[in-house]
Amino acid sequence: MNSKAFNTVKTEESTNVWLTPRELLDKLGHFDLDPCASTIRPWDCADINYTKEDNGLIQQWFGRVWCNPPYGSEAYPFLKKFSEYNGPGLMLLFTRTDIKAWHDYIFPTAKYLFFIKGRLKFCRPDGSQKATANAASCLIAWDESEFELLKKLEKEGLGKLAILS
C-alpha cells in the first residue's frame, strides 16, 4: 500500500472529512491549535482553528496541537509537519502501520501510540454520527507531556498505550 492510501476509508458517504467525536475530544483536554479544522464544524477542537483556506501546513504551530487530518492523501503532509513540530499535542489517525509514512514519521520520532479500543464513529460537519469507521484508530504523541493523559485513558479502558523507544 502506498502513502496515498494512508487514511482512505470507503463508506456509503464519499468524503475525506471525518470530524472527531465530541465524546473523545472531551476526554483529551484543552488544545491551543487545530491546524486542519473543518470549515463547517459543530464544535471547535481548539482555541485557534486553521481551515483549508488558512492552510495549516504553512502556518506556525504552537502550544498543544490537536490534529485529526483530512483522510486520504491529504493526511501525509500533516503527519510530516507534526513529526517535525515535535511539541505537545495529539494526532488521530487510522492504525495502518504498514504504510510507509508510519515508518518515516511515526516509528522513528513519536513517543507514544494509544490504540483506541473498537472503532470510532466519526461525525459529519453537522455533528451527526457517521457509520462506524472500517479501521481502528490511534492517538500519536511526539511529546512526553501526553504520557499521563494517555495512561489515564488506558486505566479508563479506552484503549492500550504503547511506549516507543
Go through each PLM region and give its residues:
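Class I S-adenosyl-L-methionine-dependent methyltransferase catalytic core
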Residues: 1-165
